[in-house]
């Protein structure tokens, strides 16, 4: 049998391990790369290679994250693993590693623990769409009833946060034994990989989503009209398309009469490209940075929302002091700052640098937003926090 040719055309899916400290997330990550490399080709990554996670910066925040890659016969996966709990919190809130699905690792010897709950809650808040459970260390539990009990607890916990607990795939395994090459436990890793392939749907590519362009600049070109520039966030824009200008002011409709890149006229602009769009009959002063051009009806402007926020610590260049309710910083969405006020959860009086917190925000101008939109919190141009829109209120 000839060796299967490596195809770059395989669908690309982003996943990651989440769960309580010491439940075996990193060991599982190593086991997946090792077992899949053995069965389907690819590179194995050793535990200590993954555990010594390099530092990276996302929105000015230092996060330790390890990225590994592996293949199943039908897909290519990029997988993120974080060494510390704080790194997970930052990672999920900043969207540094956007996950199409997560593998929740729960040690069968412990059952669900505080961080298990917190990671599920964060997953819900930041929009991780699918969770698969790996019940780890099952080689250390010989009581079938105990395993069933832990499984039931995990399902209840998932349901509590609006994940389909009853239908969630749960694999009983032992990451360490699989890593050590014990066949019956290697099987469990293949079973997990199969669930990744079948339970997590193929993510919709940015180019297939409705058109959206955050406006960075506005120019007036004599005799031709108004041009807005920016990087297409998603979708495709073609000459002749009708678009809406959304955010800050009342939503307005216009038509794109030309798309250009590097001063050359194009038929279309696609997700990821920096373009200029010429707008028919729109005056220079009717548009400003911070608005978006979007497919009509695809996105709406809002001022009030619930969010999950990480507040930078002093060492990360954040505030040195706590803030209280009524705090009025700037919220930076896509290309612009908008002032807003915050409300803290009941019983919370103040927020310390380094905390993560759920807060309700009220902006002074509406911004085009949907659930899952990331933002930074700034004071005088300095980033002091990162957040994600968890739920739109109005």
UniProtKB/Swiss-Prot annotation:
Keywords for this protein: Cytoplasm, Elongation factor, GTP-binding, Hydrolase, Magnesium, Metal-binding, Nucleotide-binding, Protein biosynthesis
Enzyme Commission number: 3.6.5.3
Region feature (G1): 19-26
CDD domains for this protein: EF_Tu, EFTU_II, EFTU_III
Binding sites annotated in the UniProt record for GTP: 19-26, 81-85, 136-139
G4: region residues: 136-139
Chain segments carrying region G3: 81-84
Reaction(s) this enzyme catalyzes, per UniProt: GTP + H2O = GDP + phosphate + H(+)
Main localization category: cytoplasm
Residues binding Mg(2+), per UniProt: 26
Function recorded in the entry: GTP hydrolase that promotes the GTP-dependent binding of aminoacyl-tRNA to the A-site of ribosomes during protein biosynthesis.
Subunit structure: Monomer.
Family: Belongs to the TRAFAC class translation factor GTPase superfamily. Classic translation factor GTPase family. EF-Tu/EF-1A subfamily.
Record's protein name: Elongation factor Tu
Biological source species: Haemophilus influenzae (strain ATCC 51907 / DSM 11121 / KW20 / Rd)
């Amino acid at each position: 049998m000839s060796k299967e040719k490596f195809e770059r055309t395989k669908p690309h899916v982003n996943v990651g391990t989440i769960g309580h400290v010491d439940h075996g997330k990193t060991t599982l990550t190593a086991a997946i790369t090792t077992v899949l490399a053995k069965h389907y080709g690819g590179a194995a990554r050793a535990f200590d290679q993954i555990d010594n996670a390099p530092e990276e910066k996302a929105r000015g925040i230092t996060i330790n994250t390890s990225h590994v890659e592996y293949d199943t016969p039908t897909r290519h996966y990029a997988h993120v693993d974080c060494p510390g709990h704080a790194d997970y919190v930052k990672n999920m809130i900043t969207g540094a590693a956007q996950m199409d699905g997560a593998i929740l690792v729960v040690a069968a010897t412990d059952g669900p623990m505080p961080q298990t709950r917190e990671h599920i809650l964060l997953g819900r808040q930041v929009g991780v769409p699918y969770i698969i459970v790996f019940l780890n260390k099952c080689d250390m539990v010989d009581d079938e009833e105990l395993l069933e009990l832990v499984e039931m607890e995990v399902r209840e916990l998932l349901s509590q946060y609006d994940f389909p607990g009853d239908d969630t795939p749960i694999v009983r395994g032992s990451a360490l034994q699989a890593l050590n090459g014990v066949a019956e436990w290697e099987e469990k890793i293949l079973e997990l990989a199969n669930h990744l392939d079948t339970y997590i749907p193929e993510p919709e590519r940015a180019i297939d989503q409705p058109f959206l362009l955050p406006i960075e600049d506005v120019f007036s070109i004599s005799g031709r009209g108004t041009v807005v520039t920016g990087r297409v966030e998603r979708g495709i824009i073609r000459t002749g398309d009708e678009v809406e200008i959304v955010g800050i002011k009342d939503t307005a409709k216009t038509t794109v009469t030309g798309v250009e890149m590097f001063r050359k006229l194009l038929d279309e602009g696609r997700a990821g490209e920096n373009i200029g769009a010429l707008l028919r009959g729109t005056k220079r002063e009717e548009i400003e940075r911070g608005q978006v051009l979007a497919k009509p009806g695809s996105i709406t402007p809002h001022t009030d929302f619930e969010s999950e926020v990480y507040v930078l610590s002093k060492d990360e260049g954040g505030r040195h002091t706590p803030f209280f309710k009524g705090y009025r910083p700037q919220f930076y969405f896509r290309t612009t700052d908008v002032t807003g006020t915050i409300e803290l959860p009941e019983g919370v009086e103040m927020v310390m640098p380094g905390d993560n917190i759920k807060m309700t925000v009220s902006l002074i101008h509406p911004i085009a937003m949907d659930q899952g939109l990331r933002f930074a919190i700034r004071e005088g141009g300095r980033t002091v926090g990162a957040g994600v829109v968890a739920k739109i209120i109005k």
